[in-house]
Amino acid sequence: VEIYLPAHYDAEREEPYKVLYLSHGGGGEEGDWFHQGNAANIVDRLVTEGKCEEFIIVCMNNAEYIIEGMRDWDFDAIFENTKDYLIPYIEQNYNVSTEVADRAYAGLSNGAKTTTMIYYKDPELFGYYGMFSGSAAWAWPELEDYSAMKEPNIYLAAGFADHLMM
């Protein structure tokens, strides 16, 4: 796990921080959003310019959960780890809000696929979901029942020539 704390992080601040859980894509690791994506620099600049408030980013290594004999991630294990261990750990060790409305999950490529599965399994675990250049999650039979997907706060994005979205 790699964690971004705002420049002026205050463990005793009265108002707890919001949290963005951010998943890398296939072949990546927890540091990709910071080392390749410059997430910390981007957020620092947005905060400095008054375009967003300070928040915490938590990046996990989802590539550790690969189904044996397959190239795909074990999305059930990632979901359980996030829900049962990662969120409670962050909430116990950092000054963060425990309100669902103050928690978001987003991911790139295979991370977007992860985001889709987490949303499907427990749409109320996070207040917001972001899927960036995600692959064909609709190919999963379990996603044919959309009844759990009510009033979503979802942001979808893909590049103009992103073949995964065509």
Where does each model-flagged region fall?
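Non-catalytic cap/lid and distal C-terminal segments of serine-dependent acyl enzymes
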Residues: 1-166
